[in-house]
Structures are given as structure tokens and as C-alpha cells.
From Swiss-Prot:
It catalyses: uridine(55) in tRNA = pseudouridine(55) in tRNA. This is tRNA pseudouridine synthase B. Gene3D superfamilies: Pseudouridine synthase. The keyword Isomerase applies.
């Protein structure tokens, strides 16, 4: 049983909580891992790697993430979200045109300071551990990229206006911090009210299954399990000859005539089973394929 599960994580549960619950319905020999932590207050797509799928994580964890976020204007939070201590600001009228102007400032590459309530390490401790002790330390800004930032809806009728955003961004982007920083630019303060991850790479919310569905019946796990090659289908596929199998299985390179445009490929057995991921290096008119992950999926 090797592959991926596209879990729709509920609120009030950590990403590790999801892993712990799945471990109860899987044989112990299968490793589990997730692609990208979701905060407890967030819901939505949490891809979980099963068995040999955990060995594919390094190749896909940098994929683009998409979120639907609601932010509240006119207040701030010590955690930058609705679960923290809220401080209300002096009411200030915000014009819709001003919002669009500010959003434009955050599109593209920028540097973002991670929040104190985060799992980032500082001198051997997680930042949230220090924050719970009432400490605040200087954090290094990290480069992020916002590919798309779209205003979906604005509710100006409430005492504290709310904005709904669609955010497509790089790995490591804190949506809480994005909302906080937008509030700072608007001059009114803001915090994240709700968050849903709608996509993580090729994993989409429309195809996600609930954790309860998986736990309810063992056969549901098999139904929901996506193939091992699901998140790497964008890589070129090469079908190996029987004579080439021993070399790949033992981590040795092979040569193929002709050049490849992609630096990385998928290698399959003659029967169509994924065997390895390989680095493709062109030399003259040939390509050398060096396996960097070999899957022993029959174990």
C-alpha cells in the first residue's frame, strides 16, 4: 500500500493529529508523512504520503499552494489570527480602491518575517514555545512569492469589515502574516479570520476526502489511495528494458541514445510499474540516467 491520500483536514486538528489517526488504520510497517503543515485553525487540502510515497516528498514539497482566506479589518491579534488575543483599533474608513492598491504591493517576490506563533526554530526552540513564555525575538525575513492575490469579496456592512482573498503562493508563505501585513499597509490593522487550503500542487480540494471517511472502513483507505506517481506525473516517463532493471535497482546509471529536455524523469518497469526517479544528464548525443530514488514497492 504505497501512494498518497488527499485529506480534507478539519479545523481544530493539527497536521500531526491527522497522521496519528491514520496510523491507527494502517499496518505499522507503512511510514506516513504530510506535504506542508496546516495550522489547527486552518482546514482543507493536506496531502499525506503513504509507504514509498514518503520518499517522493522532497520532490514535490515545493509545489505552489492555494488558499481561500478571510481577514478582518480594524483589529489585530497576537497570533495574527482569530485564535489569539484581539486588540481593537480606532475605526478608520477604508476605500475599496485603496484595498486593491495595497494588494498589488504584495504580489510577486518579497521577504516575509515569520510570526512568533510558528514552528520556525530559534536557537534550538520553536518560536511558538518562546511566544507562550511571553518572549519575542528577532526573526530573519524569508523570501516568498505571491503568484496570485485576488479579492473575492468585501463585506463593508459589518462593524469590522471583512475581505475574502484567494492566494496562490510559494512554500513557506504565512497567510496569517500576509493578512497582518496588509492591515498594516491599510493603516487599520487586520487578522486572519478563516483559512482553507484549496490546492497543494496537484492535490485539489474538490477531490479531497474526509478523515472520517478513511477511518470508518479499511476498504475506504484503498479507494482513496492515489497512485505513487500521482504528484510526479509532470515528469517525462521512460519505460525500461528488462536488461536495464538490475542497474537501476542497484542505483547504477544507464545510458540512452538521444537528449532529454527535462533534468528529472520517471523510470518504469516493462510491466508499467514505477521503479525510480532519475536525474537526466545530457552528454553529446546521449543521456545518462542516474537514479536518485529507487522504490521497492513489493516489500
Amino acid at each position: 500500500m504505497h501512494g498518497f491520500l488527499n485529506i480534507n483536514k478539519p479545523q481544530a486538528m493539527t497536521s500531526f493529529d491527522v497522521i496519528k489517526k491514520l496510523k491507527k488504520v494502517l499496518p505499522r510497517k507503512y511510514k506516513l508523512g504530510h506535504l506542508g503543515t496546516l495550522d489547527p485553525m486552518a482546514e482543507g487540502v493536506l496531502p499525506v504520503a503513504v509507504g514509498c510515497g514518503t520518499r517522493i516528498i522532497p520532490f514535490v514539497e515545493d509545489e505552489t499552494k492555494e488558499y481561500i482566506a478571510t481577514m478582518t479589518l480594524g483589529a489585530s491579534s497576537d497570533t495574527q489570527d482569530a485564535w489569539g488575543v484581539i486588540t481593537y483599533h480606532t475605526p478608520r474608513k477604508i476605500e475599496p480602491a485603496q484595498v486593491e492598491k495595497v494588494l498589488a504591493l504584495f504580489r510577486g517576490k518579497s521577504r516575509q518575517v515569520p510570526p512568533m506563533y510558528s514552528a520556525v526554530h530559534h536557537e534550538g526552540k520553536r518560536l511558538y514555545e518562546l511566544a507562550r513564555q511571553g518572549l519575542e525575538v528577532e526573526r530573519k525575513a524569508r523570501e516568498i512569492e505571491i503568484f496570485e492575490l485576488e479579492l473575492l469579496n468585501a463585506d463593508w456592512e459589518q462593524e469590522l469589515p471583512q475581505l475574502s482573498l484567494r492566494v496562490s503562493c510559494s512554500r513557506g508563505t504565512y497567510i496569517r502574516t500576509l493578512c497582518h501585513d496588509i492591515g498594516q499597509e491599510l493603516g487599520c490593522g487586520a487578522y486572519l479570520s478563516s483559512l482553507r487550503r484549496s490546492r497543494s500542487g496537484c492535490f485539489k480540494i474538490e477531490e479531497a476526502v474526509s478523515l472520517d471517511y478513511i477511518i470508518e472502513k479499511r476498504e475506504n483507505l484503498s479507494r482513496a489511495l492515489l497512485p505513487l506517481d500521482y504528484p510526479i506525473n509532470n515528469l517525462p516517463l521512460i519505460s525500461l528494458k528488462s536488461a536495464e532493471l538490475p542497474a537501476i535497482i542497484n542505483g547504477r546509471q544507464i545510458s540512452r541514445t538521444g537528449k532529454l529536455a527535462s533534468p528529472r524523469v520517471r523510470l518504469y518497469t516493462p510491466e508499467g510499474q514505477l521503479l525510480a526517479i532519475a536525474e537526466a544528464n545530457n552528454y553529446n548525443e546521449d543521456t545518462v540516467l542516474q537514479p536518485c530514488r529507487v522504490f521497492k514497492i513489493n516489500e
